[in-house]
Amino acid sequence: PYGTKSPASIARYACQAAALLQRRDIKLLVVACNTASAVALDALREQMRPLPVIGVVEPGAAAAVDARPAGRHLVLATEATVRLGAYREAILGLDAGATVDELACEMLVALAEVEQRRGSVAETFAGVIGGDGAVAVSASILID
């Protein structure tokens, strides 16, 4: 788990993993980790050039805005993702009328990592926080 690591460590780990994949002659890299996308996407794009590198923050933010235009969104994510404000920036970049709150929630990350991020986990967090709808995005849940 990257969430409590320093940005330098996260970028180093992500770039090392990408280098291993690059040796396998991949055609595209999807960075399917919110924290790695928030911290290391630019470094990965530079390292993997000319291959396309796609992160999950921008598509996740777009899904949240599509689900709740001008809505209030709560981002539950790793400490690093929250500290960087990646979702806040991406959501507000798409919808200046949105409200974005962020909360570091390492327990949710642990649940997601054991593939319990659907159904009851998302519903439990929505109920605890008082949300009436949730869009699950990797290890983050955006709730309005």
Predicted region positions:
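Non-catalytic structural scaffold of enzyme domains
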Residues: 1-144
